């Protein structure tokens, strides 16, 4: 996919036509413009979600939805940049929305609350992935990994902590090393799901 390789800026009707070996104008028989093409692309990748039916365990299903969504965004880096807009309304997207709502049916809460929980998880995933993608872009641009950057700034950080002006920051840094992205994702996801569970009647947690 052009957007996967080169980003959305490289996605033009002419470029798509070249990839397909077709005339540019012939594409307009199928899609009206680039925005409509992107909506079709969003719906296509929504079909990569592996959650096919609700298991009855809301926590397990929401965690799976979050991990799947992160995976889709990382495989298609362009997707996170358009995910804040209007939701896609294609069949794959609507099916995933339906499954997500069904997965939360065992929460025993009203539809509005289900929507809020779903949005909280979804927006967390988007924000987390945007951070991951930004790190990758910096690494490609500078040739410096996040580990190498941390090592390079460590003397400065230690110098600042030694002043005693940042006791809370010092305790946080001294408590252990930074989590890698996978571990950080799971930690925050479980924190969110714990917060949701804490709002439920005991029998539904």
Language-model segments: residues:
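Amphipathic alpha-helical interaction segments
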Residues: 36, 64, 95, 99, ...
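Hydrophobic alpha-helical connector segments
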Residues: 50-95, 111-112, 118-121
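Short amphipathic alpha-helical interface segments enriched in basic and hydrophobic/aromatic residues
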Residues: 46, 50, 70-74, 105, ...
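A contiguous pocket-lining binding segment that forms or flanks enzyme active sites
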Residues: 99-148, 152
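Helix-turn-helix
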Residues: 2-36, 40
């Amino acid at each position: 996919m052009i957007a996967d390789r080169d980003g959305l800026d490289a996605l033009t009707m002419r470029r798509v036509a070249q990839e397909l070996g077709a005339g540019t104008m012939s594409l307009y028989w199928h899609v009206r413009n680039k925005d409509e093409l992107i909506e079709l692309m969003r719906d296509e990748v929504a079909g990569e979600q592996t959650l096919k039916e609700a298991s009855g365990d809301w926590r397990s299903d929401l965690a799976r939805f979050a991990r799947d969504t992160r995976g889709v965004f990382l495989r298609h880096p362009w997707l996170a940049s358009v995910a804040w807009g209007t939701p896609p309304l294609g069949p794959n997207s609507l099916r995933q929305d339906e499954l997500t709502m069904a997965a939360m049916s065992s929460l025993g809460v009203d539809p509005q609350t289900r929507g809020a929980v779903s949005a909280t998880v979804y927006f967390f995933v988007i924000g987390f992935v945007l951070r991951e993608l930004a790190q990758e872009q910096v690494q490609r641009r500078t040739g410096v990994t996040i580990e190498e950057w941390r090592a390079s700034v460590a003397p400065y950080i230690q110098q600042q902590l030694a002043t005693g002006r940042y006791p809370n920051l010092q305790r946080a840094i001294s408590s252990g090393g930074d989590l890698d992205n996978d571990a950080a994702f799971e930690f925050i996801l479980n924190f969110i799901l714990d917060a949701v569970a804490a709002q439920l009647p005991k029998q539904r947690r």
